[in-house]
Amino acid sequence: MKKKAMALTVAAMMAAAMITGCGQTAAPTVETAADTTVQTEESTADTESTAADTAAADGESYTIGISQFAEHGSLDNCRTGFLEGLKEAGIEEGVNLTVLFDNAQADTATASMISDNYVSQKVDLICAIATPSAMSAYNSCLDSDIPVIYTAVSDPVSAGLAKEDKTPEGNITGTADTLPVEAQLKMIREVLPDATKIGILYTTSEANSLSTIETYKELADDYGFEIVESGINTLADVDMAAADLAAKVDCISNLTDNTVVQGLQTVLAKASAAGIPVFGSEVEQVKNGCLAAEGIDYVALGKQTGAMAAKVLKGEAEASDMPYEACEGANLYINTEVASDLGITFPENYEADAAEVFETVTVE
């Protein structure tokens, strides 16, 4: 029996008919919140175009909806990778693929409106980026045969999207961005040998954050840490919560919490004022001013998701039969400018071992 991952709010249901801002046309690509231009390596571009041209010549074409919960680097990278994964499978935007894209701007009611709209337009597939959008898409598609492929969902089981054995709770599957918490704790201990308290800021309504914090708590003692958490409800809460948390801990470890990531510059400012570092959870956060991260490559995760979606679109597999997949391994990212500003010296092997070293802070 299908079950709802999250009850739709009354406001979302009343507003579903008002989603004129998400209205799409027959153009090959419709963008209402962000640019979905995808860049691929020149060495593979010709092969991918040929595959898509062949599919188009055979009369195969698809329309998909991409619902992204918030606008920040990791989710943008997921979307880029997702379209690259489809392209590598011969499904190319503007050739045999129409993409309807909408960004919920970190609002769950808007996410529900977006997925409801895609269902009314009878798209061939919905790609949901981040846990709240995935839960909304799942609910919207309960009474339809539209498959949902999600990405950047940290814990599909706690979100009600999958069973413990990774099999789907309906016509929905995708990829999980479960954070490498143990690798992160090990790295923090190496960088801050005298630290005892790690602060974590999270949104109380994000299931992915709640489950990740539990993992932190389970493992923290093994590395001599105490986890100090602070919950927020909206982006407006970040300023006060970050300042209060920074005064109590030796460092902050950032999650992939969508609301907190949107307020990352505020978190960084409060931490800097307190003289403590912020550790990120993926490459964009380190680029934007976090000290370091054992994190995930979200472009690669998106490509993995795109490959799964291509199988569903081509009729090679049913989403309801595909266990969700997880991103394997972690990459080390460091920012030497941040380290210098804080008077922190990385272990001598870090620059050589890092997947990427940022020498400056770049905020886009």
Go through each PLM region and give its residues:
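Hydrophobic alpha-helical segments within soluble ligand-binding/sensing domains
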Residues: 56-58, 155-197, 296-317
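Extracytoplasmic "Venus flytrap"
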Residues: 62-89, 100-109, 205-209, 259-260
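Short, solvent-exposed amphipathic alpha-helices that sit
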Residues: 74-90, 183-184, 208-225, 266, ...
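Pocket-lining segment of extracytoplasmic ligand-binding domains
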Residues: 207-282
